[in-house]
């Protein structure tokens, strides 16, 4: 299926690895132009693969917790391409800031995981109105299930879902669609780092995978990317304000089925 994304310009925050990297790559395969916003330069092999798929794909170094950098990077994107068709808010980290961490640590977690979602939307929306574009917010199943000992991350992910609905309402008259994708267990570099903290990482992986109803396996970054890119496309032209769980039934299906 042609998603009709050729030459559409899409900013992807945290778009150089993991879920964000998969989204950038899928956009390039659809002949869209991904603009990767990331703190650190992407791996050379990733950039080469991206350029093979879409020579106009671009990386911009951006510290998303710096509002001025967000503003300037969006302005640079517009100066380079003359338009903006989509925003994928993706960057963040499950940082383990729980109830014992204190207010300052909690607020810092919101800065890492939530505030830049708003900042990016704030600076992108005027341009998205001009193209009747789309926003996709990458959230997490922790927004609806909790996890324990990660208050900052869960608060951020829950707020992202609320903002998805709020922005969908606020932007409806401008034809800008806003949706959220909600992963659960996805094997990414950050997830591997977390698994490595367990005494027996392989046993922990097997334990988690066994609880996923559909296929007893982890969701892949590509499966998240497929959904996100579809939502960015005209093929999802009457879909807005939705929360799409892409998790093999992990969040909602009866665990007795497993």
From Swiss-Prot:
Enzyme class: oxidoreductase
InterPro entries: NAD(P)-bd_dom_sf, SDR_fam
Molecular function GO terms recorded: 3-oxoacyl-[acyl-carrier-protein] reductase (NADPH) activity; nucleotide binding
Keywords: Carbohydrate metabolism, Fucose metabolism, NADP, Nucleotide-binding, Oxidoreductase
EC number: 1.1.1.435
Binding positions for beta-L-fucose per the UniProt entry: 94, 140-141, 147, 153, 184-185
GO terms classed as biological process: fucose catabolic process
UniProt-listed SUPFAM superfamilies: NAD(P)-binding Rossmann-fold domains (SSF51735)
Keyword Nucleotide-binding attributed: yes
Pathway recorded for this protein: Carbohydrate degradation; L-fucose degradation
Binding site for NADP(+): 17, 19, 39-40, 63-64, 90, 153, 157, 186, 188
Pfam families, per the entry: adh_short_C2 (PF13561)
Active site, renumbered: 153
Catalytic activity line of the entry: beta-L-fucose + NADP(+) = L-fucono-1,5-lactone + NADPH + H(+); D-arabinose + NADP(+) = D-arabinono-1,5-lactone + NADPH + H(+)
Purpose: L-fucose dehydrogenase involved in an L-fucose degradation pathway. Catalyzes the oxidation of L-fucose to L-fucono-1,5-lactone. Can also act on D-arabinose, with lower catalytic efficiency, and has weak activity with L-galactose and 4-deoxy-L-fucose. Shows a preference for NADP(+) over NAD(+).
Sequence similarity: Belongs to the short-chain dehydrogenases/reductases (SDR) family.
Miscellaneous comment: L-fucono-1,5-lactone is unstable and is rapidly converted nonenzymatically to L-fucono-1,4-lactone.
Subunit structure, as described in the record: Homotetramer; dimer of dimers.
The protein's name in its UniProt record: L-fucose dehydrogenase
Organism from which the protein derives: Burkholderia multivorans (strain ATCC 17616 / 249)
